Amino acid sequence: MSVQSPLIAVPRKTTTDVDWATPIRHVIAASYGEDPNSYAEECAVLQRCRQDAVRGAGNDQTARDLLYKYFGQLELLELRFAEIKVSFPWNDAFTDKLTTQTSLAFEKASIIHLISSILSSLAQSASRSDPEGLKRAYYNPRATAGMLTYINENFLHAPSTDLSREVVHLLIGIMMAQAAEIFTEKLVEEKKSASLVARSANQTASMYTSVVDEMKEFQGKGVFDRNWLYVLQIKAKLFGSLTQYYKATSDSAAGKHGTALVRLKIANSLIQDAQKQASSFIYTFVAASTPSLPHDAANALNEIVKAHATVCGEAKEQAVKDNDLIYHEVLPSEASLPAIEKLPPAAPITIQDVYGNQEVTKLIGPDIFLRLVPLAVHESASVYSEEKAKLVRAEVDKVELAEGEIQAGLDHLNLPEEIDRWRQFLEGDTNDDVPLSQQLKSLVDSVGDVRQVENDLGRLDGERGACERELRELNGALDAESRECERMRAKYTPNFTQSPSGPQTANLRSNLSANLSALSSASTSDAHLQSLWQSIQPSISLLSSGPSNLERAARDITEGNSQKIDKTVSLLDLDDEEVDRKALGQEEKDALRKAVDDGREKLDRLKKIRAERDEVLRDLKEKIQTDDVSNLLLLNRRSQNVEPQLFASELEKFRPYQTRLAAAVSASRSILQELDMLVAQVHKGTGFREILRKEKDRQRIIRDWEKRLIEAGESYAEIRAGLGKGLSYYDSLRRVIEDLRMEVQRFTNSREQERRNMVSDIETRQRLGGTSPSTGGVVANRGLEERLAALKMEAPPQPPRLGTTSTPNLPPPPGRGSSNVTSSYLPPPPPPKPQSNPYDFSTLAGFGSFATPSVSSPQHVYPSQPQQAYNQQSYIPPQQNPYYPPPPSRPTYASPPFAPQQPPMQSGHSPYAPPPGHAPQPQQPQYPSSQNQQQRQGYEYPGYGQQGGYGGGYGQY
């Protein structure tokens, strides 16, 4: 067909610029709580996008693409700003009336109407003579109909005429009729069967007839151009004629010549009417007044009608002649002719199909306000992220479980070391190196120099002996002071009134005895350390010799020379230690060689599978990390209960990764089973079993030897810890002894000064009184002095000598003999105390400068009347003497317990000097009672027995 049939295009709506920025900024500030200024660029992009779409382009593909983009952004914009109010002015496409609304739906409907106008214009201008133009001409009317259908289905209340349901429905009918027309033209052009062309033409004629009937209802309303009606009427009659013509051709071919002749007459009648209308349309059509039609619409339509009229006329005349001369068939009436079937019309292309195209998606581009995500979308995205995290955790758990099974299986089979050992058996590699455990190697590095331990053991003995000597010296000083006091009392009785020192030194003596008992326990701990060191010294010397000597010793043991290293290793265990490498037969060697090759191949394959599995897991994690469904959630925001289906469909993207991971896990387990079977098969060989037995014996001996060395190392660590505690204990005991020494010195010096003053006062009074001791008194005094010289002061039970388990005994006073004479005024010895912990000094927590007792020391008041004679004086025990109050209960102090308390001193004279006219009333320094001492075994720091420190000592193993 040389002339192209004219098509009708939908008129275009027009508009002016709008302000997007101000309403969007207001919504961002009010609803999202963000800074609107940060979205100024997005607002400008949206503003420019609208201007380009509605004003910057014509009726070409560029205009269509810009409109596609703008409408897509409107869809995304509505998801975030559904209630935004912007004034959108649009002029009606048919009446040119201005309509302004603030609804975003009005803007969307107007843009869709404008898109349909552009699509219909593209269909109108497409050249149908080439295949590509024909495709566009057939596609665009259907896409236009789909766009208009979307308007009718989604925008119910039209604010303008061009968006009303009746007008839009009429436009849809015109577009679909034109699409059917183009399809019929294609069938005619391709010379398809006459019956098929007749059916398609009948459908086209029916659609045009329906549109003509609808348009007649708008007559006189000034909506549609009257030229549209002329074109539609002409096309309705044209395609009706085409229907009858091609059906007649089909009937004639079928031998129905009478029916064919009747149909040709009908076709000729219809085309004659169409020709009359087309001829008049040429004179009434003005192209400038109807821009929706091509400028040559009248001429083109007239040419098409005229050409078909000529064909119909010739065909009718020929059919009449043939029937009159040849067929002589009776012509049926028109009413009796069978109805012609209609070809089903093509469906409109929906807007979803248009925007589902990848090219259109690329045109839309990313969301302009991508950074602005509603809270509901954030919440849904968080739920999806948790679903992804569950998926990843499940796959990671499966992979970790599979890896653990593989590692446990390889460790159980001792692979790949077992295969290397098989290779050594085959190659006769007699490597005598004995691998040492990592624990033993670490122990070698930690032993260090053993000479320091021997030096510290020597220091312990020296410190213990020095402490014992000093404590006994302090006991001796107290004994000497007590003897001197009693000697003066016997000499100057009854005028010598100095109180006995026994009650005053009870606590000091108790402290000294407790320290000696503690030294006895410390001696036991020291002896235990010494014994333990002697038992492990050879092993520790070997460990300290370095890794090379240790490996040499291990080789000596495996070679049967254990007497050089460890006498506890039985030579009977090493009789068969030298493995006979030639115990395998040739058949077993061949089988073992094949097993080595198979094992290596399977291990290599297992390594590749593990690497591939880990790579797939990394890819899965990266894929899940970068996966974002916020846009999909935003698009489906208005849908109800869509999240489960959406999440399920999105998670299906990761199904291939899960499948690959499952396959890798299954393959690794299969290979592990094959390796297990391979090792079991190799171990079944008789010669190999013998080799394994000897190797196991060899390994057992080495492990036992290593175990003994490790136990020696643990004992060595205990010795070093005990030495540290013991030396710290003796250092602390030294400080306590020094405090006791100072207290004893203060006490003895004070007592000596008091005696001097008292003796001087007695001698002065005797000289002034002119009296002298009587001869009998002198004789009596001499006898008493002789008895006192032989007097042996009763001391508390002595602790045993160091190295024994009993309490050491204090030495007798130097220079005095033993005597059974006891003075009636001497206090009874303190009750024996249980063996004390040498490190627990909590019993002396209230002495000296370390702490102040919680109760003040009471002063002992003596009567002022003359004292009884020495041989008439009776001793009152401390618990019955009213001048000696009971000792206060021992408080708990944080200070060192054995530091004695210094008695109060007065400047200028002795605290024990009596006031004038009175007998001396010395202030007795009081010491806390040690009745409730808690005893422990081992070393403890003095003063720390109850407040931390080292507690029960190092000596308890």
UniProtKB/Swiss-Prot annotation:
GO terms for cellular component: endosome. The keyword Coiled coil applies. Residues 449-493, 585-626 form a coiled coil. Keywords: Coiled coil, Cytoplasm, Endosome, Protein transport, Transport. Residues 945-957 have a biased composition (Gly residues). It comes from Cryptococcus neoformans var. neoformans serotype D (strain B-3501A). It comes from the Eukaryota. PROSITE patterns: BRO1. GO terms for biological process: protein transport to vacuole involved in ubiquitin-dependent protein catabolic process via the multivesicular body sorting pathway. Residues 6-406 form the BRO1 domain. It is found in: Cytoplasm; Endosome. Residues 826-835, 879-890, 912-925 have a biased composition (Pro residues). Residues 926-944 have a biased composition (Low complexity). Belongs to the BRO1 family. It holds the Pfam family ALIX_LYPXL_bnd. Residues 751-779, 795-957 are annotated as: Disordered. Residues 751-766 have a biased composition (Basic and acidic residues). Involved in concentration and sorting of cargo proteins of the multivesicular body (MVB) for incorporation into intralumenal vesicles. Residues 851-871 have a biased composition (Polar residues). This is Vacuolar protein-sorting protein BRO1. Its main location: cytoplasm.
